Amino acid sequence: MDIVSIAWAALMVVFTFSLSLVVWGRSGL
């Protein structure tokens, strides 16, 4: 596994986490 795929996977995880965090925040949780 090279550094590019690791960085891409980390970026996807951070993007998904922040997106769900925004959705939960707007839901008033």
Swiss-Prot record:
It comes from the Eukaryota. The keyword Chloroplast applies. The chain crosses the membrane at residues 3-23. It is found in: Plastid, Chloroplast thylakoid membrane. GO terms for cellular component: chloroplast thylakoid membrane; cytochrome b6f complex. Keywords: Chloroplast, Electron transport, Membrane, Photosynthesis, Plastid, Thylakoid, Transmembrane, Transmembrane helix, Transport. One of its GO terms (biological process) is cytochrome complex assembly. Its main location: plastid. It holds the Pfam family PetN. Signal peptide: none annotated. It is a single-pass membrane protein. The keyword Protease does not apply. InterPro entries: Cytochr_b6-f_cplx_su8_sf, Cytochrome_b6-f_cplx_su8. GO terms for molecular function: electron transporter, transferring electrons within cytochrome b6/f complex of photosystem II activity. Component of the cytochrome b6-f complex, which mediates electron transfer between photosystem II (PSII) and photosystem I (PSI), cyclic electron flow around PSI, and state transitions. Belongs to the PetN family. The 4 large subunits of the cytochrome b6-f complex are cytochrome b6, subunit IV (17 kDa polypeptide, PetD), cytochrome f and the Rieske protein, while the 4 small subunits are PetG, PetL, PetM and PetN. The complex functions as a dimer. This is Cytochrome b6-f complex subunit 8. It comes from Angiopteris evecta (Mule's foot fern). The gene is petN.
